[in-house]
UniProtKB/Swiss-Prot annotation:
NCBIfam families: rplB_bact. Part of the 50S ribosomal subunit. Forms a bridge to the 30S subunit in the 70S ribosome. This is Large ribosomal subunit protein uL2. The lineage of its organism: Bacteria, Pseudomonadati, Pseudomonadota, Gammaproteobacteria, Enterobacterales. Keywords: Ribonucleoprotein, Ribosomal protein, RNA-binding, rRNA-binding. It comes from Edwardsiella ictaluri (strain 93-146). It holds the Pfam family Ribosomal_L2. The gene is rplB. Residues 28-54, 221-274 are annotated as: Disordered.
């Protein structure tokens, strides 16, 4: 893994910082594990914008990732690491002993030729997946399930991890990167180690066009709009003279948005404020 700072041969190259990984596969992805990935432009079925700042971008194919890791007792070997345009983490193509191939999230340190396994009998090493009741307290894990058999939901992006801090009966307590402490059923699975490609956070796109290649459109300030477009719009000066709100008039800057009260009982400690 190398961090490459481009020379300022043009204004668009001046600030570019790339993350180069020579271990990534340079050919085409494994075709049977690809699916069509249609772009929405941030619109719903009525044609209305439901998510702002989305549109354009390069065509992409979705890689079917195995978040469940449920082929117990069958060893697999890592064939190669690949780039995935749909996520910040890299992915690994693994070949199981029964001949099946699957994509998984590439754990930190995982490389071609490594052996991995899933199930209660799997060894305690990075890339292996076990129920959390079988993982030692203090271990760092990723791709963590929140319901048994549902597939990993927590800690899936580049460099992400969760730490197991306690085990109490049918639940384990996890410390998330946000500082939140949360109880999860001990039968839920997790993959040992951190997600790889942690250097992803160091990259600098360098120009607006690089964001457009990724399907990200500009973010316009509310104060730069007209009153018809945003509550902050209009006026002669730059001061909008009211509490900051979203384009729909909902208070922003610190307003709580969590509505899933049903699972509040599993949160031991709220996330720490920045």
């Amino acid at each position: 893994m190398a961090i490459v700072k481009c020379k300022p041969t043009s204004p668009g190259r001046r600030h570019v910082v790339k993350v180069v990984n020579p271990e990534l596969h340079k050919g085409k992805p494994f075709a049977p594990l690809l699916e069509k990935n249609s772009k929405t432009g941030g619109r719903n079925n009525n044609g209305r914008i439901t998510t702002r700042h989305i549109g354009g971008g390069h065509k992409q194919q979705y890689r079917l990732i195995d978040f469940k890791r449920n082929k117990d007792g069958i060893p697999a070997v890592v064939e190669r690491l690949e780039y995935d345009p749909n996520r910040s983490a890299n992915i690994a193509l693994v070949l199981y002993k029964d001949g099946e191939r699957r994509y998984i999230l590439a754990a930190k340190g995982l490389k071609a030729g490594d052996q991995i396994q899933s199930g209660v009998d799997a060894a305690i090493k990075a890339g292996n997946t076990l129920p959390m009741r079988n993982i030692p307290v203090g271990s760092t894990v990723h791709n963590v399930e929140m319901k048994p058999g549902k597939g990993g939901q927590l800690a899936r992006s580049a460099g992400a991890y969760v730490q197991i801090v306690a085990r109490d009966g049918a639940y384990v307590t996890l410390r998330l990167r946000s500082g939140e402490m949360r109880k999860i059923p001990a039968d839920c699975r997790a993959t040992l180690g951190e997600v790889g490609n942690a250097e992803h956070m160091l990259r600098v796109l360098g120009k607006a066009g690089a964001a457009r290649w990724r399907g990200v459109r500009p973010t316009v300030r509310g104060t730069a709009m007209n009153p018809v477009d945003h509550p902050h719009g209009g006026g002669e000066g730059r001061n909008f003279g009211k509490h900051p709100v979203t384009p729909w008039g909902v208070q922003t800057k610190g307003k709580k948005t969590r509505s899933n009260k049903r699972t509040d009982k599993f949160i031991v400690r709220r996330r720490s404020k920045k």
